[in-house]
From Swiss-Prot:
<dbReference type="InterPro" id="IPR031310">
    <property type="entry name" value="Ribosomal_uL5_N"/>
</dbReference>
<dbReference type="InterPro" id="IPR002132">
    <property type="entry name" value="Ribosomal_uL5"/>
</dbReference>
<keyword id="KW-0699">rRNA-binding</keyword>
<dbReference type="Pfam" id="PF00281">
    <property type="entry name" value="Ribosomal_L5"/>
</dbReference>
<dbReference type="Pfam" id="PF00673">
    <property type="entry name" value="Ribosomal_L5_C"/>
</dbReference>
<keyword id="KW-0687">Ribonucleoprotein</keyword>
<comment type="function">
    <text>Binds 5S rRNA, forms part of the central protuberance of the 50S subunit.</text>
</comment>
<dbReference type="GO" id="GO:0003735">
    <property type="term" value="F:structural constituent of ribosome"/>
</dbReference>
<dbReference type="GO" id="GO:0019843">
    <property type="term" value="F:rRNA binding"/>
</dbReference>
<comment type="similarity">
    <text>Belongs to the universal ribosomal protein uL5 family.</text>
</comment>
<comment type="subunit">
    <text>Part of the 50S ribosomal subunit; contacts the 5S rRNA.</text>
</comment>
<dbReference type="GO" id="GO:0009507">
    <property type="term" value="C:chloroplast"/>
</dbReference>
<dbReference type="GO" id="GO:1990904">
    <property type="term" value="C:ribonucleoprotein complex"/>
</dbReference>
<dbReference type="GO" id="GO:0006412">
    <property type="term" value="P:translation"/>
</dbReference>
<dbReference type="GO" id="GO:0005840">
    <property type="term" value="C:ribosome"/>
</dbReference>
<dbReference type="InterPro" id="IPR020930">
    <property type="entry name" value="Ribosomal_uL5_bac-type"/>
</dbReference>
<dbReference type="InterPro" id="IPR031309">
    <property type="entry name" value="Ribosomal_uL5_C"/>
</dbReference>
Length: 181
């Protein structure tokens, strides 16, 4: 029977990281604290259907209702007033986080056309990983017929790693398909 990503983490990844980085305390072991999904919706200020469609897609992808991000101040150049919706975001933790990451690694990323792995250069230098998805159609929950327009989203994986090497080791041990270029 296949193990879940959380079981793999506790049974395989933790002992491997303790050996690799010579940790003396179990609490020093790296872990993922949260995964944040974000989508900017500048055009949602003119068309409310775009906001509703994006909320529905995020609920399908993540399993929870997204937070609507509103403009903090008015910007005449972008035709945005204070309080208008400019994006949506979801923060996943615990069980939903592991479920989403497992689905992303094993189902969604391989569905990208000409996929050769994700870039190692997307780490922020402190062990956190950022990934931009160009189209929401790679997720199995999104049906092609239900999509009115192809929109992307940003995925941020926040870890307890202090360095980029630790972050790479953690995500690689969890099965993230990095390209080695």
């Amino acid at each position: 029977m296949n193990k879940s990503l959380k079981e793999i983490y506790y049974q395989d990844v933790i002992p491997g990281l303790i050996e690799q980085f010579n940790y003396t305390n179990i609490h020093q072991v790296l872990k993922i604290t949260k995964i944040t999904l974000n989508r900017g919706l500048g055009e949602a200020s003119k068309n409310n259907k775009i906001l509703e469609a994006s909320i529905k897609e995020f609920e399908l992808i993540s399993g929870q209702h997204p937070l609507i991000n509103k403009a903090r101040k008015s910007v005449a150049g972008f035709k945005i007033r204070e309080g208008m919706p400019v994006g949506i975001s979801v923060t996943l933790r615990k069980k939903l986080m592991y479920t989403f990451l497992e689905k992303l690694i094993h189902l969604s990323l391989p569905r990208i056309r000409d996929f050769r792995g994700v870039s190692v250069k997307s780490f922020d230098g402190r062990g956190n990983y950022n990934l931009g998805i160009k189209e929401q159609l790679i997720f199995p929950e999104i049906e092609y017929d239900q999509v009115d327009q192809v929109r992307g989203l940003d995925i941020s994986i926040t870890t307890t790693a202090k360095t980029q090497q630790e972050g790479i080791a953690l995500l690689r041990a969890l099965g993230m398909p990095f390209n080695d270029n």
